[in-house]
Protein backbone atom coordinates (compact mmCIF):
# COMPACT_ATOMS: atom_id res chain seq x y z
CA UNK A 1 0.00 0.00 0.00
CA UNK A 2 1.30 3.45 -0.94
CA UNK A 3 2.04 6.24 1.40
CA UNK A 4 -0.88 8.48 2.39
CA UNK A 5 -0.72 12.03 1.07
CA UNK A 6 -0.41 14.66 3.76
CA UNK A 7 -2.46 17.74 2.89
CA UNK A 8 -0.74 19.95 5.48
CA UNK A 9 2.64 19.29 3.86
CA UNK A 10 1.21 19.95 0.42
CA UNK A 11 -0.29 23.24 1.65
CA UNK A 12 2.99 24.29 3.28
CA UNK A 13 4.80 23.61 -0.01
CA UNK A 14 2.18 25.51 -1.98
CA UNK A 15 2.40 28.49 0.39
CA UNK A 16 6.20 28.59 0.09
CA UNK A 17 6.11 28.26 -3.71
CA UNK A 18 3.46 31.00 -3.95
CA UNK A 19 5.51 33.31 -1.73
CA UNK A 20 8.54 32.70 -3.95
CA UNK A 21 6.61 33.28 -7.18
CA UNK A 22 5.10 36.52 -5.89
CA UNK A 23 8.54 37.80 -4.97
CA UNK A 24 10.48 36.57 -8.02
CA UNK A 25 7.91 35.68 -10.68
CA UNK A 26 7.12 32.26 -12.11
CA UNK A 27 10.34 30.35 -12.72
CA UNK A 28 11.05 28.30 -15.83
CA UNK A 29 12.22 25.34 -13.74
CA UNK A 30 11.24 23.61 -10.50
CA UNK A 31 14.59 24.04 -8.76
CA UNK A 32 14.00 27.59 -7.39
CA UNK A 33 10.56 26.60 -6.10
CA UNK A 34 11.94 23.47 -4.46
CA UNK A 35 14.73 25.48 -2.82
CA UNK A 36 12.25 28.09 -1.56
CA UNK A 37 10.04 25.33 -0.14
CA UNK A 38 12.97 23.46 1.43
CA UNK A 39 12.28 20.31 -0.55
CA UNK A 40 13.29 18.53 -3.74
CA UNK A 41 11.95 18.66 -7.28
CA UNK A 42 10.84 15.06 -6.84
CA UNK A 43 8.71 15.90 -3.80
CA UNK A 44 7.06 18.80 -5.61
CA UNK A 45 6.18 16.44 -8.45
CA UNK A 46 4.90 13.88 -5.93
CA UNK A 47 2.53 16.43 -4.41
CA UNK A 48 1.51 18.36 -7.55
CA UNK A 49 1.92 15.89 -10.42
CA UNK A 50 3.70 18.11 -12.95
CA UNK A 51 5.49 21.43 -13.11
CA UNK A 52 2.50 22.97 -14.87
CA UNK A 53 0.18 21.48 -12.25
CA UNK A 54 2.22 23.15 -9.51
CA UNK A 55 2.34 26.47 -11.39
CA UNK A 56 -1.44 26.39 -11.92
CA UNK A 57 -1.94 25.90 -8.18
CA UNK A 58 0.57 28.65 -7.37
CA UNK A 59 -1.30 31.01 -9.70
CA UNK A 60 -4.62 30.04 -8.13
CA UNK A 61 -3.31 30.58 -4.61
CA UNK A 62 -1.79 33.95 -5.56
CA UNK A 63 -5.04 34.99 -7.21
CA UNK A 64 -7.06 34.06 -4.11
CA UNK A 65 -4.72 36.17 -1.98
CA UNK A 66 -5.02 39.10 -4.39
CA UNK A 67 -8.80 38.90 -4.58
CA UNK A 68 -9.09 38.74 -0.79
CA UNK A 69 -6.93 41.81 -0.24
CA UNK A 70 -8.10 43.94 -3.16
CA UNK A 71 -11.80 43.13 -2.81
CA UNK A 72 -11.59 44.52 0.70
CA UNK A 73 -9.86 47.64 -0.63
CA UNK A 74 -12.61 48.43 -3.14
CA UNK A 75 -15.60 47.47 -1.00
CA UNK A 76 -18.13 50.13 -0.18
CA UNK A 77 -17.66 51.84 3.19
CA UNK A 78 -20.78 53.44 4.70
CA UNK A 79 -19.19 56.71 5.85
CA UNK A 80 -16.77 57.35 2.99
CA UNK A 81 -17.22 58.73 -0.53
CA UNK A 82 -16.55 55.92 -2.99
CA UNK A 83 -13.99 57.99 -4.89
CA UNK A 84 -11.97 58.20 -1.64
CA UNK A 85 -12.17 54.41 -1.35
CA UNK A 86 -10.99 54.04 -4.95
CA UNK A 87 -8.13 56.49 -4.39
CA UNK A 88 -6.87 54.51 -1.40
CA UNK A 89 -7.32 51.24 -3.31
CA UNK A 90 -5.34 52.62 -6.26
CA UNK A 91 -2.46 53.57 -3.93
CA UNK A 92 -2.31 50.01 -2.61
CA UNK A 93 -2.86 48.24 -5.93
CA UNK A 94 -0.29 50.35 -7.78
CA UNK A 95 2.16 50.51 -4.87
CA UNK A 96 4.39 48.00 -3.06
CA UNK A 97 1.42 45.94 -1.83
CA UNK A 98 0.22 45.35 -5.39
CA UNK A 99 3.58 45.09 -7.13
CA UNK A 100 4.03 41.31 -6.72
CA UNK A 101 0.60 40.66 -8.23
CA UNK A 102 1.16 43.16 -11.02
CA UNK A 103 4.46 41.50 -11.89
CA UNK A 104 3.06 37.96 -11.80
CA UNK A 105 -0.30 38.54 -13.45
CA UNK A 106 1.05 41.15 -15.85
CA UNK A 107 3.23 38.46 -17.36
CA UNK A 108 0.35 36.02 -17.38
CA UNK A 109 -1.64 38.42 -19.55
CA UNK A 110 0.89 37.63 -22.27
CA UNK A 111 -0.19 34.79 -24.52
CA UNK A 112 2.35 32.41 -22.97
CA UNK A 113 0.38 32.40 -19.71
CA UNK A 114 -2.94 31.33 -21.18
CA UNK A 115 -2.09 27.58 -21.35
CA UNK A 116 -1.31 27.60 -17.61
CA UNK A 117 -4.66 29.17 -16.75
CA UNK A 118 -7.21 28.93 -19.54
CA UNK A 119 -9.75 31.70 -19.12
CA UNK A 120 -7.48 33.80 -16.89
CA UNK A 121 -8.13 37.02 -18.76
CA UNK A 122 -11.89 36.64 -18.37
CA UNK A 123 -11.65 35.71 -14.68
CA UNK A 124 -9.23 38.55 -13.99
CA UNK A 125 -11.78 40.95 -15.43
CA UNK A 126 -15.12 39.70 -14.17
CA UNK A 127 -14.26 39.04 -10.53
CA UNK A 128 -13.87 42.77 -9.81
CA UNK A 129 -17.10 43.96 -11.39
CA UNK A 130 -19.57 43.17 -8.57
CA UNK A 131 -17.77 45.14 -5.81
CA UNK A 132 -17.13 48.03 -8.21
CA UNK A 133 -20.81 48.09 -9.23
CA UNK A 134 -21.83 48.20 -5.58
CA UNK A 135 -19.51 51.13 -4.93
CA UNK A 136 -20.50 53.01 -8.06
CA UNK A 137 -24.16 52.57 -7.11
CA UNK A 138 -23.50 55.09 -4.33
CA UNK A 139 -22.62 57.63 -7.03
CA UNK A 140 -25.80 56.64 -8.86
CA UNK A 141 -23.77 55.15 -11.71
CA UNK A 142 -23.35 51.37 -11.25
CA UNK A 143 -23.02 51.00 -15.03
CA UNK A 144 -19.65 52.80 -14.79
CA UNK A 145 -18.08 49.83 -12.97
CA UNK A 146 -16.77 48.50 -16.29
CA UNK A 147 -15.26 51.89 -17.11
CA UNK A 148 -13.62 52.10 -13.66
CA UNK A 149 -12.19 48.60 -14.10
CA UNK A 150 -10.94 49.41 -17.60
CA UNK A 151 -9.21 52.57 -16.34
CA UNK A 152 -7.59 50.70 -13.43
CA UNK A 153 -6.41 47.84 -15.65
CA UNK A 154 -5.20 50.16 -18.40
CA UNK A 155 -3.25 52.34 -15.99
CA UNK A 156 -1.78 49.26 -14.31
CA UNK A 157 -0.60 47.97 -17.71
CA UNK A 158 0.85 51.43 -18.40
CA UNK A 159 2.59 51.45 -15.01
CA UNK A 160 3.91 47.92 -15.56
CA UNK A 161 5.30 48.89 -18.98
CA UNK A 162 6.70 52.34 -18.13
CA UNK A 163 7.22 52.50 -14.38
CA UNK A 164 5.87 56.07 -14.51
CA UNK A 165 4.11 56.22 -11.14
CA UNK A 166 3.68 59.99 -11.11
CA UNK A 167 1.89 60.10 -14.47
CA UNK A 168 -0.35 57.08 -13.82
CA UNK A 169 -1.26 58.36 -10.34
CA UNK A 170 -2.15 61.75 -11.77
CA UNK A 171 -4.24 60.13 -14.52
CA UNK A 172 -6.16 58.02 -11.99
CA UNK A 173 -6.87 60.98 -9.74
CA UNK A 174 -7.99 63.05 -12.75
CA UNK A 175 -10.34 60.20 -13.65
CA UNK A 176 -11.75 60.11 -10.10
CA UNK A 177 -12.33 63.87 -10.20
CA UNK A 178 -14.20 63.46 -13.49
CA UNK A 179 -16.54 60.74 -12.18
CA UNK A 180 -17.01 62.52 -8.86
CA UNK A 181 -18.12 65.67 -10.65
CA UNK A 182 -20.26 63.86 -13.26
Label the model's feature ranges.
Residues 67, 71, 97-102, 106, ...:
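Amphipathic alpha-helical packing segments from all-alpha helical-bundle domains
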Residues 12, 16, 20-53, 57:
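Helix-turn-helix
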Residues 1-8:
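N-terminal intrinsically disordered/low-complexity leader segments
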Residues 57, 70-102, 144, 148:
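Hydrophobic alpha-helical connector segments
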Residues 107-111, 148-168, 177-182:
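Amphipathic C-terminal alpha-helical segment
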Residues 5, 18-22, 61, 112-116:
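Recognition helices and adjacent regulatory flanks at domain boundaries
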Residues 60-67:
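Short, basic, alpha-helical segments at the C-terminal edge of helix-turn-helix-like DNA-binding modules
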Residues 12, 16-23, 69-73, 104-111, ...:
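Solvent-exposed, amphipathic alpha-helical segments
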Amino acid sequence: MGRQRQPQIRQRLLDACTDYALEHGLPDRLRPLAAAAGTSNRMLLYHFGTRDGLLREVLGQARRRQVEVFTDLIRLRPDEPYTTTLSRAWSAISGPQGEPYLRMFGRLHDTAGEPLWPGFRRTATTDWLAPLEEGMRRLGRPELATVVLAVIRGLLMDLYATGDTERTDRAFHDFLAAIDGA
